[in-house]
Amino acid sequence: MTATLEVILTPAEFGPLRERDLSQTVCVVFDILRATTTMITALANGADSIIPVEQIGEALEVRRQRPNVLLAGERDGVRIRANQTGGIEFDLGNSPREFSAEKVQGKTIVMTTTNGTRALRACATAKTV
């Protein structure tokens, strides 16, 4: 059995992944500066689940369908604010410190980030992520 390792370093490289058959691929996503660390922190502090989405609009659509979810995310390192969404302030940014048990325990979190959630979504069709 031959194994191949591919390293993708920037969001610009995600596009070609979407065009490939990843059904027999294992994707490992490390966004060590924020997104995956924040997700692990949320789950460790009792969050029920995290729904990663690529775009702010997708997060807002999930909130419309499921009003009890928390919205979390950033663009270029700054929490998403009401002026970016047409008036809806995100509940959390993308810092592990924000995801305390008091805020996230028992909650579903919809998360969108500049890089991390996009990397996860690019690998969505993989056999294992």
Segment roles from a protein language model:
Residues M1-E61, P67:
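N-terminal glycine-/serine-/threonine-rich phosphate-binding loop
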